[in-house]
Swiss-Prot record:
Protein name: Valine--pyruvate aminotransferase
The family this protein is said to belong to: Belongs to the class-I pyridoxal-phosphate-dependent aminotransferase family.
Gene Ontology MF annotations: pyridoxal phosphate binding; valine-pyruvate transaminase activity
Entry-linked CDD domains: AAT_like (cd00609)
Pfam short name (any one): Aminotran_1_2
Catalytic activity: L-valine + pyruvate = 3-methyl-2-oxobutanoate + L-alanine
Keyword vocabulary terms for this entry: Aminotransferase, Pyridoxal phosphate, Transferase
GO cellular component entries: peptidoglycan-based cell wall
Record carries keyword Transferase: yes
EC number: 2.6.1.66
Cofactor: pyridoxal 5'-phosphate
Length: 388
């Protein structure tokens, strides 16, 4: 039997998942893990969602749904855009996906061919780069720094040559948490329309924005040619339910329907039924309560990092991460994070995951967990850093 592995499978790992594996082993062997490596909310799904799931299990009516998702959920999502953003979204434009990860795969397959040039910010979410590379696209990474809040601008896109076929933006962004101001997102969307470039707008962290940050906006407020990606994982704390959605332009809907029907048949039906209840006032109040907890954690982490000598931090407008410059201590963030875990039991994510050129000098620290974990992590890191 041949030992050949397809070339497209040779993408880099998502290093955060490797960190999680090492963290689990640390907990198994030492029992002292403090895990600040991933965007895993400590809160569970809202109570109305869990109650709806229990009722659906009791009825035992969990066969396939149509590929694009159950009508009740598509209706609820469409109505939520009117409430939150004041825009009218037809339920037919909403496509339910197997997490936002499944949504990105569908969007990239529907929008781009092998060889197409697709731009993204660096630092940025590594799975954009890795999925696009596996599909044969040419990924154009745009170095972004403090001058633009680690975000691309329409002017930066206009200066790229040869021309692009697509652009991926995220607001709030992972790993930095920065928000693209509404006027800049509108400028990016307008430039994409004028340049025949497909915009993919990652809005997974909408709802998680802190006081004083720019307001978040939806790409569809400017352009219905964009593909919007969102998820139940972050604001609604439903990571393991594997449910997300797309807003899809009319011209792409049949293609997305065919792709999802062939790939997954349908998203998880139990999750779909339960998620309808995420849009109740009770569930929204619970999710907003989580945001208040994250805000406390954010202050704890930002203040604590500065006290221990890590003070060059990306503006943490939203999401639940701090992207920190640790160049005073290392130029190899992967080795730095591995040693931190081995020496102290604290797990954080290496910046090399998010920026292949400059990420050796950065780390990402999540504050989605309990406040006590953040306080303990700061104590351990503060004791450990002077020896590095």
């Amino acid at each position: 039997m041949t030992d050949r592995v397809a070339l497209r499978a040779g993408v880099p790992p998502f290093y955060v998942m490797d960190v999680w594996l090492a963290a689990a082993e640390r907990q198994r062997t030492h029992g002292d893990l403090v895990n600040l490596s991933a965007g895993q909310p400590s809160a569970g799904a809202p109570e109305p969602v869990r109650a709806a799931a229990a009722a659906a299990l009791h009825l035992n009516q969990l066969g396939y749904s149509v590929a694009l998702g159950i009508p009740e959920l598509r209706d609820a999502i469409a109505a939520d855009y009117q409430r939150r953003h004041g825009i009218t979204v037809e339920p037919d434009a909403v496509v339910i996906t197997t997490g936002s990860s499944g949504g990105f795969l569908l969007a990239f397959l529907a929008c781009f061919d092998a060889g197409d040039r697709v731009a993204m910010a660096s630092p940025g979410y590594p799975c954009y780069r890795n999925i696009l590379s596996a599909l044969g696209c040419e990924v154009v990474e745009i170095p972004c720094g403090p001058q633009t809040r680690f975000q691309p601008t329409a002017q930066m896109l206009a200066e790229i040559d040869p021309p692009l076929r697509g652009v991926v933006v995220a607001s709030p962004a992972n790993p930095t948490g920065t928000v693209i101001p509404p006027e800049e997102l509108a400028a990016i969307a307008s430039w994409c329309d004028a340049s025949d470039v497909r915009l993919i707008s990652d809005e997974v962290y909408h709802g998680l924005v802190y006081q004083g940050a720019p307001q978040t906006s939806c790409a569809w407020q400017t352009s219905r040619n964009a593909v919007v990606v969102n998820s139940f994982s972050k604001y609604y704390a439903m990571t393991g339910w594997r449910l997300g959605w797309l807003l899809v332009p009319t011209v792409l809907r049949r293609a997305v329907d065919c792709l999802t029907g062939n790939f997954t048949i349908c998203p998880p039906v139990l999750s779909q039924i339960a998620a309808v209840s995420a849009f109740t006032p009770e569930a929204t109040a619970e999710a907003d309560g989580n945001l208040a907890s994250y805000a406390i954690n954010r202050s704890l982490l930002l203040d604590g990092l500065r006290r221990i000598g890590i003070d060059r931090l990306a503006p943490t407008d939203g999401a639940f991460y701090v992207y920190a410059d640790v160049s005073d201590f290392t130029s190899d963030s992967l080795a730095f994070c591995s040693k931190l875990l081995a020496d102290t039991g604290v797990a954080i994510a290496p910046g090399i995951d998010f920026d292949t050129a400059r990420g050796g000098s950065f780390v990402r620290i999540s504050f989605a967990g309990p406040s006590g974990d953040i306080e303990e992590a700061l104590r351990r890191i503060g004791s450990w850093l002077p020896s590095q």
